[in-house]
From Swiss-Prot:
Enzyme Commission code(s) on record: 1.2.1.8
Record note on quaternary structure: Homodimer.
Any one Gene Ontology BP term: glycine betaine biosynthetic process from choline
Protein name: Betaine aldehyde dehydrogenase, chloroplastic
Compartment(s) where it occurs, according to its Swiss-Prot or TrEMBL record: Plastid, Chloroplast
Extent of the transit peptide: 1-7
Source organism per UniProt: Amaranthus hypochondriacus
Keyword NAD: yes
GO molecular function: aminobutyraldehyde dehydrogenase (NAD+) activity; betaine-aldehyde dehydrogenase (NAD+) activity
Keywords of the record: Chloroplast, NAD, Oxidoreductase, Plastid, Transit peptide
Listed GO CC annotations: chloroplast
Length: 501
């Protein structure tokens, strides 16, 4: 059952603050097309306030309140946040489903992962204490050297709408664990749960300014945040086009960035698979999260000897997916996030048709849903490598398909993309899977599955899918500066390079 969406302001310096220009943006429920609330629209003036608050949080009490405090001290806050989110799991899941159209069961799993991510980085914060002053072996006995890991400073975090709170947490949790202070700018298409994260931070007593949350449009809030001279690093998840702009802005100040961008990931199906198991993983890999996954395995490569039988089986699986209001029991496919995204997805499908491709199933609005931005799970065959549907990211429930005859051809087709986020290979021959895994030009490979993601494992891409790694121990390293400290251990002996005066 839907719930009321709370009305919030911007979260700056531990307080709710009205945007300086007092503007707000309507929230549209993508399953009903109705306005269910609004969010504050931050601008450059609000960014100034938030960045200043974050800088003060770093310096307060000479850093002892946060940046220079022990990892164990910060871990207590992260665990408190995790506990509070777990306590409010149903509330957060319902808000997520209303805001972005995610099936309620999926949203609930996401909230579990949010709490788990804060718990994991609480552990990482504590582990950071033990890693401080790690000794470095030197070839000279008269010197001792060790390494300090210190927070990089104020970080700007820009997160997407497909996993609104979870992808924000992928950035917030490690940044706070490292001792950074942060300004989070979630997507204006799905900001509600990020604002509720602010309320959780207020409830657990997170020091003012450690986490500031600004909602608003990209050009008006995200742009000023990315290029702000007092922001020491930017982490961005979103489209490749926007990521390029973020990188350009940061480059003017030689500011480090982490980018997780678009994808057009392949799933390679060999002739020895169990057809039903492979069909379900293929559907899940492309249609989970309503097809709006940066790593969606949306290019299906299937061995020519089983292609006809496999596609027939896959179509049956896809037609059996329950498409409904996200709150309906058993929903497995909800609407895409917005009207513009809905129109974009349908345009991709119509362009594929006009270029000569065949729609095996789906391709339009489900007949039983007259309102909402719903698109049927769509499978497109007779695709050439020059077609738009093969080359460009759709970000919707659309799968395109080609066949291959050999392992080498499969690898060539799989790597035929500007992107390199993820890939899947399905075969009972694990030696073959290992060969394919090594040859794929991506940041993550799934063997005999597609899309499982764990907080403990690194996440990121190659090529135009970005660079840097989130999650795992790599996630916290994103927000740390490494400082070498070398000490002369000789007693009163001079260095001896210059002649004594």
């Amino acid at each position: 059952m839907a719930i009321r969406v709370p009305s919030r302001q911007l979260f700056i310096d531990g307080e709710w603050r009205e945007p300086i220009k007092k503007n707000r943006i309507p929230i549209i429920n993508p399953s009903t097309e109705e306005i269910i609330g609004d969010i504050p629209a931050a601008t450059a003036e609000d960014v100034e306030l938030a960045v200043a608050a974050a800088r003060r949080a770093l310096k307060r009490n000479k850093g002892e309140d946060w940046a220079s405090a022990s990892g164990a001290h910060r871990a207590k806050y992260l665990r408190a946040i995790a506990a509070k989110i777990t306590e409010k799991k149903d509330y957060f899941a319902k808000l997520e489903a209303m805001d972005c159209g995610k099936p309620l069961d999926e949203a609930a799993r996401d909230i579990d992962d949010v709490a788990g991510c804060f718990e994991y980085y609480a552990d990482q914060a504590e582990a950071l204490d033990a890693k401080q002053k790690a000794p470095i072996a030197l070839p000279m006995d008269t010197f001792k050297c060790h390494v300090l890991k210190q927070p990089i400073g104020v970080v700007g975090l820009i997160s997407p709408w497909n996993y609104p709170l979870l992808m924000a947490t992928w950035k917030v949790a490690p940044a706070l664990a490292a001792g950074c202070s942060a300004v989070l700018k979630p997507s204006e298409l799905a900001s509600v749960t990020c604002l509720e994260l602010a309320e959780v931070c207020r409830e657990v007593g997170l020091p003012p300014g450690v986490l500031n949350i600004l909602t608003g449009l990209g050009p008006e809030a995200g742009g000023p945040l990315a290029c702000h001279p007092d922001v020491d690093k930017v982490a961005f998840t979103g489209s490749t086009a926007t990521g390029s702009k973020v990188m350009s802005s940061a480059a003017q100040l030689v500011k480090p960035v982490t980018l997780e961008l678009g994808g057009k990931s392949p799933i390679v199906i060999f002739e020895d698979v169990d057809l039903d198991k492979a069909a379900e993983w293929t559907a899940f890999g492309c249609f989970w999260t309503n097809g709006q996954i940066c790593s969606a395995t949306s290019r299906l490569l299937v061995h020519e000897s089983i292609a006809a039988e496999f596609l027939d089986r896959l179509v049956k699986w896809c037609k059996n997916i329950k498409i409904s209001d996200p709150f309906e029991e058993g929903c497995r496919l909800g609407p895409v996030v917005s009207k513009s995204q809905y129109e974009k997805v349908l345009k991709f499908i119509s362009t594929a048709k006009s270029e000569g491709a065949t729609i095996l199933c789906g391709g339009s609005r489900p007949e039983h849903l007259k309102k909402g931005y719903y698109v049927e799970p769509t499978i497109i065959s007779d695709v050439s490598t020059s077609m738009q549907i093969w080359r460009e990211e759709v970000f919707g429930p659309v799968l395109c398909q080609k066949t291959f005859g050999s392992e080498d051809e499969a690898i060539e087709l799989a790597n035929d993309t500007q992107y390199g986020l993820g890939a899947a290979v399905l075969s009972k021959d694990l030696d073959r899977c290992e060969r394919i895994t090594k040859a794929l030009e991506v940041g993550a490979v799934w063997v005999n599955c597609s899309q499982p993601c764990f907080t403990q494992a690194p996440w990121g891409g190659t090529k135009r899918s970005g660079f840097g790694r989130e999650l795992g121990e790599w996630g916290i390293e994103n927000y740390l500066n490494i400082k070498q400290v070398t000490r002369d251990t000789s007693t009163d002996e001079p260095w001896g390079w210059y002649k004594s005066p």
